[in-house]
A protein has these predicted regions:
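Nucleotide donor/acceptor-binding cores
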Residues: 4-6, 76, 105
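ATPase catalytic-site recognition across NTP-hydrolyzing enzymes
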Residues: 138-187
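Walker B catalytic acidic pair
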Residues: 81-83
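Conserved RecA-like ASCE P-loop NTPase motor core of nucleic-acid helicases/translocases
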Residues: 5-18
Length: 187
């Protein structure tokens, strides 16, 4: 249920992910809402609830005080998507700085299961609540063929980590497809 006259914020790591992944989903969820392309906001005409959609990409060459979220006053909820892509808690701290008003502001952080999740440690340290949910746990909404296709197309370790939520510490090669005989050029 949307709170009237509130503003919420959705953050992801890149504009490309916002355009190709989140935007089509939000378009489905927010039928009847109006979209402002220059501000990247969705507004509910009934409650006047606004959802700001931002990508948080700050190259290491920019100073940490530069804040892509600057100026927003969020009074509803803040969602950070793809938390595993952020190497430090910077984006979470900046998002918390935007949650300034309203009744019980809420920060929700979502990401893939990887070993040494900085963002999950941040939640634990703040006595927050962590929910471990996998695609497998959501199987009533996914077809059997979806799981079969995932098993056929993903490497076994990736299937275990991303679908079954059983990540393993990294070992050996970063990319399992790497073949030293094919991919290394010697002088």
């Amino acid at each position: 249920k949307w709170r009237p006259n509130c503003a919420s914020l959705i953050i992801t790591d890149t504009h490309q992910r916002w355009m190709q992944v989140l935007s089509p989903e939000i378009r489905k969820w927010c039928k009847g809402w109006s979209y402002n392309g220059s501000l990247h906001t969705w507004t509910d005409p009934t409650t006047n609830h606004v959802i700001w959609c931002k990508s948080y990409f700050r190259p290491n060459t920019q100073q940490a005080h530069k804040n892509p979220l600057e100026g927003l006053n969020i009074s509803g909820a803040c969602f950070i998507d793809e938390c595993q892509t952020f190497g430090t808690p910077e984006v979470a701290h900046k998002a918390l700085g935007r949650l300034r008003s309203g009744t019980d502001p809420l920060l929700i952080m979502v990401g893939l299961p990887i070993v040494s999740d900085m963002w999950m440690k941040l939640v634990e340290d703040a006595d927050g609540h962590i929910i471990h949910a996998t695609s497998y746990a959501n199987q009533q909404n996914l077809s059997k063929s979806w799981f079969e296709a995932a098993k056929k197309t993903l490497p076994p370790d990736e299937y275990e980590a991303m679908i079954m939520n059983r990540p393993k510490p990294p070992k050996g090669l970063i990319y399992s497809e790497f073949d030293e005989l094919k991919n290394v050029i010697e002088n």
